[in-house]
């Protein structure tokens, strides 16, 4: 486990050193916000569907065992 941690720190350090001279990357902020909104709406829809299913199962008449 210690070797893995050392390797990870080494890779991060090397990437920081090699990228320090490169031009900063342009991040498409608008696209990230759009995807975030879509994912948020999808998660809300799943949450609402789950809640509706729970309420339905609670109110549904239960079958009696013989």
UniProtKB/Swiss-Prot annotation:
Induction description: By bacterial infection.
Pfam families, sorted: Moricin
Signal peptide: 1-24
Expression by tissue: Expressed in fat body and to a lesser extent in hemocyte and Malpighian tubules.
GO biological process: defense response to bacterium; innate immune response
Domain of life: Eukaryota
Subcellular location as annotated: Secreted
GO CC terms: extracellular region
Keywords: Antibiotic, Antimicrobial, Immunity, Innate immunity, Secreted, Signal
Disulphide bonds in the chain: none
Family, per entry: Belongs to the moricin family.
Function according to Swiss-Prot or TrEMBL: Has antibacterial activity against Gram-positive and Gram-negative bacteria. Probably acts by disturbing membrane functions with its amphipathic structure.
Protein name, as recorded: Moricin-1
Source species of the chain: Bombyx mori (Silk moth)
């Amino acid at each position: 486990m210690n070797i893995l941690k050392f390797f990870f720190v080494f890779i991060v350090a090397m990437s920081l050193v090699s990228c320090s001279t490169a031009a900063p990357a342009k991040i498409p902020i608008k696209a990230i916000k759009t995807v975030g909104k879509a994912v948020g709406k999808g998660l809300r829809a799943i949450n609402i569907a789950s809640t509706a299913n729970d309420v339905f199962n609670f109110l549904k008449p239960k079958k009696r065992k013989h």
